[in-house]
Curated annotation (Swiss-Prot):
This is NADH-quinone oxidoreductase subunit A. Coiled coil: none annotated. It is a multi-pass membrane protein. It comes from Nitrosospira multiformis (strain ATCC 25196 / NCIMB 11849 / C 71). Its main location: membrane. One of its GO terms (molecular function) is quinone binding. Gene3D superfamilies: NADH:ubiquinone/plastoquinone oxidoreductase, chain 3. Keywords: Cell inner membrane, Cell membrane, Membrane, NAD, Quinone, Translocase, Transmembrane, Transmembrane helix, Transport, Ubiquinone. The lineage of its organism: Bacteria, Pseudomonadati, Pseudomonadota, Betaproteobacteria, Nitrosomonadales. It comes from the Bacteria. It catalyses: a quinone + NADH + 5 H(+)(in) = a quinol + NAD(+) + 4 H(+)(out). NDH-1 shuttles electrons from NADH, via FMN and iron-sulfur (Fe-S) centers, to quinones in the respiratory chain. The immediate electron acceptor for the enzyme in this species is believed to be ubiquinone. Couples the redox reaction to proton translocation (for every two electrons transferred, four hydrogen ions are translocated across the cytoplasmic membrane), and thus conserves the redox energy in a proton gradient. Belongs to the complex I subunit 3 family. One of its GO terms (cellular component) is plasma membrane. The keyword Aminoacyl-tRNA synthetase does not apply.
Length: 147
């Protein structure tokens, strides 16, 4: 038996599986088209909100800080993955691996310190000098802008 015949006998289950998956997808989509309802009404293009009547538009602005936090999460999540892989292979990597991990952590720490210093992590209102805001007698945490 030659090499191409051996390869063909080894790959036929994969080809058969692929063919069956494609046939199943086509069959389900055809069945959905045949059985499904075809009516157009005003409510057809509206999203279903569990029986609650929609009010207003769904489009509203989100602060860019939400996206910034998502980016921070991704960065430090990837850092955790790299450090976990480093910890698993710690004995094989030796001192060079340890030094590389320290450099990696230092670069990410410097980036975090830079962003913190830049104010990228401040969620509250901007801090002002004490002369511009005066304490109000109504609440200890309530400030009124003096004119």
């Amino acid at each position: 038996m030659n090499a191409s015949a051996t390869q063909a006998t080894e790959i036929w289950p994969l080809v058969a599986y692929f063919f069956l998956v494609v046939m199943l997808v086509v069959g389900v989509m055809a069945l959905s088209y045949i059985i499904g309802e075809r009516h157009r009404s005003k409510a057809t293009d509206e999203p279903f909100e569990s029986g609650i009547v929609t009010v207003g538009l769904a489009r509203f602005r989100l602060s860019a800080k939400f996206y910034l936090i998502a980016v921070f999460f991704v960065i430090f999540d990837v850092e955790a993955v790299f450090l976990f892989a480093w910890a698993v292979a710690f004995r094989e990597l030796g001192w060079p691996g340890y030094i590389e991990a320290i450099i990696f952590i230092s670069i990410l720490g410097a980036a975090l310190a830079y962003l913190w210093r830049l104010g990228a992590l401040d969620w509250g209102p901007p801090r002002h000098s004490a002369g511009r805001f005066a304490k109000d007698s109504r609440s200890p945490n309530h400030a009124v802008v003096s004119k």
